[in-house]
């Protein structure tokens, strides 16, 4: 869990540097979005490969190697910031590529250690690492960036990743797995459209999540007149509440015996909260702040459900690769959302931009294959 928290504090913590980055480098919102997107671009390019490595070599080795590489690349940005923007973007992308090891491997580990009736809760707890990582970044990075500069503030997630790498080597053990001959006889689960639909729905649900997380701090500072530290603390508190919501949705799915029914209902909630934010920005600023708080909770609650469903549908032999594909789709969406939505908001304003973003979770409602959900094979 510490490994995932540290990786998330880096990959998803860069948005908290946006106000300082824009002041230091004179960037537009869309240009700042490229720095936000760089770690997730690196991450999405390697997730499937890390997943295949976890299927082949085990989770412990994959996570230890990836966390070590993350520490080196992010530490290079923090402690010896290159003068070239391209070099900084490259190192951020390499850091994201290395952090992908954690995203691809630790979900598979949880599926191996927990029975089906407890996986929703276990995966929900695992998925709290993302909002907790974002909360850590929100509490620490904005204020630290104002004192040290934007990039040196990344020393914090680099240090967390270093500690996590050591703990993985010392503490973590891979779960038992079926004999390789039995795994090799299993065909691909991608012959059915069910997994593809879950992947697509999950990618659509990333859009509202990143609409709020990538632009929440910026909106409060630029549009509402909040201080940077206060805005970061607000987002951090919301992220902690979002972490609790992921556990709650996991328990919910265990009790109803379905991952996909709760996932679809949360997609409906994401549509509504985006539209409420758009309305608030247009006519009632206080309502927009409320929607930011609620949206930061609702739009992250579904994530663990999708990951659990994907791993259960894929089966033991394919779960690492399937989770890699799942993460890739989500991170394609998370890479594109800050740039595309930033450009749209820059032209139309937040109300129109977030109303357009509501189309994504609306598509997810239809894509989620609730009727095709079956008992897992492992």
Specify the residue positions occupied by each region the protein language model found.
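Helix-to-loop junctions at the C-terminal end of transmembrane segments
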Residues: 46-58, 246-258
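C-terminal ends and interior cores of transmembrane alpha-helices
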Residues: 68-82, 269-282
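C-terminal transmembrane helical hairpin of 12-TM major facilitator-type secondary transporters
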Residues: 259-306
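Cytoplasmic membrane-interface "Motif A"-like loop-to-helix N-cap segments
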Residues: 56-67, 255-268
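Cytoplasmic helix-loop-helix junction between adjacent transmembrane helices
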Residues: 91-130
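Extracytoplasmic gate region of multi-pass secondary transporters
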Residues: 14-15, 194-239, 243
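Residue-level signature of mid-helix packing/kink "hotspots" within the transmembrane helices
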Residues: 12, 40-48, 135, 239-243, ...
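Helix-loop-helix hairpin linking two adjacent transmembrane segments in secondary transporters
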Residues: 126-172
């Amino acid at each position: 869990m510490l490994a995932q928290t540290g990786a998330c504090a880096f990959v998803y913590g860069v948005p908290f540097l946006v106000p300082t980055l824009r002041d230091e480098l004179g960037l537009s919102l869309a240009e700042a979005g490229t720095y936000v997107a760089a770690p997730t671009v690196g991450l999405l390019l390697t997730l499937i490969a890390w997943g295949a490595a976890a299927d082949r070599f085990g989770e412990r080795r994959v996570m230890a190697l990836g966390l070590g590489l993350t520490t080196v690349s992010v530490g290079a940005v923090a402690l010896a910031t290159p003068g070239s923007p391209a070099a900084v973007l490259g190192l951020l992308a390499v850091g994201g590529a290395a952090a992908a090891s954690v995203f691809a491997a630790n979900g598979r580990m949880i599926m191996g250690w927990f029975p089906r009736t407890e996986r929703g809760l276990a995966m929900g707890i695992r998925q709290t690492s993302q909002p907790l990582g974002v909360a850590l970044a929100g509490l620490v990075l904005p204020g630290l960036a104002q004192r040290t500069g934007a990039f040196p503030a990344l020393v914090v997630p680099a240090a967390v990743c270093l500690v996590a790498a050591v703990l993985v080597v010392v503490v973590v053990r891979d779960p038992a797995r079926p004999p390789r001959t039995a795994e090799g006889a299993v065909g691909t689960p991608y012959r059915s459209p069910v997994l593809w639909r879950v992947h697509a729905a999950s990618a659509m649900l990333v859009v509202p999540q990143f609409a709020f997380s990538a632009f929440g701090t910026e909106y409060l500072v630029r549009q509402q007149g909040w201080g940077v530290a206060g805005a970061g603390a607000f987002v951090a508190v919301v992220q902690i509440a979002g972490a609790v919501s992921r556990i709650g949705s996991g328990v919910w799915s265990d009790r109803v015996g379905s991952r996909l029914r709760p996932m679809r209902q949360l997609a409906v909630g994401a549509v509504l909260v985006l539209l409420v934010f758009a309305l608030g920005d247009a006519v009632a600023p206080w309502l927009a702040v409320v929607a930011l708080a609620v949206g930061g909770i609702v739009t992250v609650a579904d994530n663990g459900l999708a990951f659990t469903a994907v791993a259960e549908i894929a089966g033991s032999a394919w779960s690492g690769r399937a989770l890699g594909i799942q993460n890739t789709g989500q991170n394609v969406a998370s890479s594109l959302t800050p740039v595309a939505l930033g450009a749209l908001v820059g032209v139309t304003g937040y109300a129109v931009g977030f109303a357009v973003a509501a189309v994504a979770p609306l598509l997810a409602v239809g894509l989620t294959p609730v009727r095709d959900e079956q008992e897992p094979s492992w």
